[in-house]
Amino acid sequence: MVKGFNVFIVLFIWRVLLGIGIGGDYPLTATIVSEYCSTANRGKLMAGVFAWQGFGNVLAPIVSIIVTACFMSKIDADVLYLDYVWRIIIGVGCIPGVATLYWRLTMADSVRFQNISANTRASSMESTRADEEKLLATETRNTNSISESNNEVAQSPLMESNRPGHTKTFSQHFSEWRHLKVLLGTSIAWFALDVAFYGINLNSAVVIDAIGFAGDLYQDKPSHFIIRNCVGNIIINILGSVPGYWITVFTIERLGRKTIQLMGFGVLAVLYVILGFAYNQILAKSTGAFIFLFSLAQLFQNFGPNVTTFVIPGEVFPTRFRSTAHGISAASGKLGAIVAQGGFLQLTNIGGHNAWIDHLLQVFALFMCIGFLATLWIPETKGKSLEEISEE
């Protein structure tokens, strides 16, 4: 028997590579848009770039429906044909990335970053000249003592790096509490959001199944069950996610980033408390009411912290640290996603099939409160230049 790779190992390897790419794209996108835009429309354009995720969230289940429909008769006869379906769907996801690769590779650094780099090089050259002059003066004064001169040469700053490394200057900057609390605020807020955001969105099929919208897996045809799940995702995204993104785009310059983030976390905490503690009662009375409240939560995720946790780290940090600090904030969010996925899978079925979903929603409410508190450490950036915000 010929043995091949375990499919989960292969997926894991490629997802790690995908994560490296996305891990670089998040801070790069936010930083470039932030540094290219004027103060008046910076937040709007940053939110607009991020809002295209909403269309991707709708397009993904549409592609899934189309591919499933193409294999419908074969899937219903043998579910192993789903192996073709999910591979094709993942392959289609490569197309947008490939389409934008050329422009991403040829995109120039912002003027702000180029100026910082030029100033750093000029400062380094001036430091070198000063060190050389100091060294020559030292040698002149100590011509009668070779050993003393050699000692001075060995200890001269010229022998060391003329410019502190990025890690050192980064550490020095964030060793001050007034700077560190901002980084902690953006990181903790993103972490708290993604626990709920990915806990729900990576498991939306579980939620759709729990409320009975997807039908019965054991009685319906497999293709019908999959398509109903996809339709459920489309409905939730169209009702909640997509409008939420674009409401933020058109209000972020008027309401402010911090205001939207605080409002979003606050409303989400209330909605998850309602959905969590009244879960069974709501479902018993009306599935439609649950879908409405669930979609409302999706709305305030995006007319709220899902957009602003991306925008704010692209504005609040100095140019020389902006992409690094944004990357740390985004990585904190993805750590929250890992916690959410692991916790959701482990806890969902405690006490029976989907029996613990109500308690998970209650846990998500707690994390929304944590995100709200972390946001208090973050300054408002509306109407301020990047230099004003970071005090450069």
Identify the meaning behind each predicted range.
Residues M1-E392:
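Transmembrane-helix signature of 12-pass secondary carriers
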